[in-house]
Amino acid sequence: RDVAPSRGLGDVYKRQRYGLGSKDTLPAHIISVYNNMNAEKPKTEFTLSINDDVTNLSLDVTESPDTTPKGTTSCKFWGLGSDGTVGANKDSIKIIGDNTDMYAQGYFFYDSKKSGGITVSHLRFGSSPITSTYLINKANFVACHNPSYVTKYDMVQDIVPGGTFLLNCIWSPEELDKQLPAKMKRYIAENNINFYTINGIKIAEEVGLPGRASTILQSAFFTIANIIPV
């Protein structure tokens, strides 16, 4: 409030809101703030991160840059509370950090249920320091450990063109074609997504690790992502 008048901006910084409903604030939202400041008639009150259809104060997002350092691999893992996905990904960070010269970063999202709720693990790896303080929305690799999510969440829309999608399921190729939403299949085809399926539960039982599908899926991630030799 003290700086704005001295720069001739009047009350342009009057009131702003962000992070409502636990929504993440991304670089694209920050860019929209600067675009607003450069506008002929900037909004003095605005909302970031959500589509504010109550007050209609949201700023338009016109670009969504990838601000992670070049060479960074960004990965998202969709799991179910207590299924071992989060624990396996925490182990993955430690394994990569201890056995490579790469930097590693992990964020973990949980819903209000401690068991049986959705979890999303956000992992980044790369040769440069990683300072991104927001969740991943441009992923090189996305894994869905619970097949019921394919009709509930837009998971593949976060995958960059040429990226990879791993789905844990029991479906045959014919069943898979019926189970996947048309929107998901279209995005995979149009963006040349590398699509893999695995029956982690069956493999875990076959190798004597019943109930440890997360370990099988972790191995699949290391194999497909080729971050460290398996």
Language-model features and meaning:
Residues 8, 137-139, 161:
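Alpha-helix C-terminal capping/helix-to-coil transition sites in glycosyltransferase folds
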Residues 14-36, 179-230:
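Short alpha-helices
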Residues 71-142:
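Anionic-ligand anchoring segments at beta-strand to alpha-helix junctions in alpha/beta enzyme folds, i.e.
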Residues 85-91, 150-154, 213-215:
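Short glycine/serine/threonine-rich phosphate/pyrophosphate-binding segments
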Residues 157-187, 195:
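ADP-ribose/adenylate-binding Rossmann-like module
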